[in-house]
Amino acid sequence: MLHSQLRKIEFKEEWNMGSILSGPLEEELERHNREMQRARNYIRSKRKKTEFELCVIGSYQMFYDQALEAVQGIRELWPGADELPSEGTGPYNTGKCLKLGPYQEDQDALEAAEVQPPVKKDRKPLYLCHGDLDQHHVLMGGSYTAIIEYNRMHLGIQISDLYRFMRKVMEKHGWNLDLGLSMLDSYERVLPMEPKERGCLYYLFLYPEKYWKQLNFYYNANKAWIPARNTDKLRGLEEQQQARNSFLKRLKADCKGCV
């Protein structure tokens, strides 16, 4: 329901002056790729390596290949899409700017619609996103559910919210396939995904975000002392690969030719 409600909010020109606009998703992931390379290159330059560093060397290529494929895949979903918004409407990419709102030719028929229609297949579907959605931001009441902390709200692809929420849950439950499919089904009963949105979700799950986080934390922290739990986290990622790959395989099969 959160995303359905956010899709009703029209873009305002004054947002251009704030942090509600963010760069393309693929550019953020490309930056993460460079950070992984930087950490790996540093580790390779060391003559004596710690247990954590040996784990990185042993698993790096597998995860980095996933990262490259994910970035390229997201970029190819909406090639050349511009993310500059115009005031007053919902996602509509003209090629020069993005207008948020229904298409002009359908305006009369859609004026009474509660939720704006999905954008055309070659347009990037940009709407307001929570930006940091996980289980800690969901409050369950006796007769209501509330979402809190919107300090990272931005204009972007709403599927990224779904990914963040699901990834945390899936990691905690060993990438349980039935659980993942149940969450996807619950989401789509309220807001069905377009094929390219499902493809984007697949590539976001393919991207090794937790692996990147471990390498980036290592590179920016005190490398003389690495907590044992960091090494355990890397090993845990490797141990979960089989279950994670099964979930990715099923997700990819449902992408209807978009990946």
Set out the residue ranges of the language-model regions.
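ATP-dependent phospho-/nucleotidyl transfer catalytic cores
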Residues: 14-90, 97-128, 182
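Conserved kinase catalytic-core helix
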Residues: 1-17
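Helix N-cap / loop-to-helix initiation motif
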Residues: 193-197
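ATP/Mg2+ or Mg2+-diphosphate-binding catalytic cores
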Residues: 212-259
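Catalytic activation segment of kinase domains across protein kinase-like and atypical kinase folds
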Residues: 136-162
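Active-site activation/catalytic loop segments of kinase-like enzymes and analogous catalytic loops
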Residues: 159-192, 205-224
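Conserved catalytic-loop position in the HRD/HxD motif
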Residues: 132
